[in-house]
Amino acid sequence: MKIILLYGGKSPEHDVAILSAFSVISAVYFDYYQVQLIYIDKTGQWVKGPLLTEAPETDEALRLTWDPTGNVVEGFSGRVISPGDIKEDNAIVFPVLHGPNGEDGTIQGFLETLDMPYIGAGVMTSACAMDKIMTKYILQAAGIPQVPYVPVLKNQWKENPKQIFDKCEGTLLYPMFIKPANMGSSVGITRAENREELQNALQEAYRYDSRALVEQGIDAREIEVAVLGNADVRTTLPGEVVKEVAFYDYNAKYIDNTIQMAIPAEIPEEVMKKARDYAKSAYTMLGGSGLSRVDFFLTNKNELFLNELNTMPGFTEFSMYPLLWENMGLKYGDLIEELIQLGKKRYEQQAAFE
């Protein structure tokens, strides 16, 4: 069977997706699978690369290059294709794409149109989980605790910034965290200690989206639970992000590597159980399939607040999701195999509906 590895993308998380894709390829059981590289560059070009029968030595090999004249260029080369050209039988797509145009339902909808099986959440789940404001509303209806928040539309802020500032300061206390509604990997997220910083933070968030979320900042640990499954949902013991920086931002996660992880987290057993229960409930409520990573805040009073549900978590060698499953006894290669089988099963079940 062929795995069509779809990676890269136009989002600011392009480079993260390449690192994740390399880790996935390195764990694939090539005795059973071939891997077809489909690279989406930063301009949105789809590039078909080689069919791999073994893992490349470095992630740089995945940054496919091509020559419009068709000449071979240095390194792995490919040719520009139309997106629909990826369709083929006896294949499953692994969309290792983070952020907008990757895990927000757009690619998932495209693959549904092509009638191809793929790994991960479906269209509705991807779209809702990617939208931080929509996720808040859904989880609030499910009774899952979250930190206080204020959604802010860009046009509202432009028309009457004082009203927005007053609303935020009347509902929340400083520090606040300001996030684009549709973005991941801490891209565009800023901490604000006063009104001036709040204004600058909103401007930063609006670089990425026309909707922003202002959240109450709290002194808390960051706890994460990995989820796996379709109808039968499994969860891991929680892990903890042990920060050496004040804010676990994009650079800390993927560039500076200034974070450490405690797996499993050193937390009371009852808190551990509650985190797993909330993770399963959130996953089920959002209609999850395949995989997700559910992130929580844990206060010194052992209060849990669900932060977000990530339908395509990072798969780099130091990413929390595969490490959490490794702690449960599921090796990286076996995890990839389970995800393939879950994707195939979901496709078969969808095809059986009238």
Regions found by a protein language model. Give the residues of each.
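A short acidic/small-residue loop/turn micro-motif
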Residues: E54, V241-K243, M312-P313
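ATP-dependent carboxylate activation and anion-phosphoryl transfer catalytic cores
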Residues: M1, Y7-G9, P268-E354
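Short, active-site-adjacent cap segments at secondary-structure transitions
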Residues: T43-K48, G184, R221-E224, L304
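ATP-binding N-terminal substructure of ATP-dependent carboxylate-amine bond-forming enzymes
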Residues: M1-I119, V123-M124, C128-M130, M134, ...
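Phosphate-binding site of ATP-dependent enzymes
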Residues: T190-D277, L298-F305
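Active-site nucleotide/adenylate-binding loops and adjacent lid/helix of ATP-dependent enzymes
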Residues: M1-Y7, S11-P12, L19-F22, S26, ...
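Short small-residue beta-strand/loop micro-motif enriched in glycine and branched aliphatics
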Residues: I119-G120, S186, I259-A262, E317-Y321
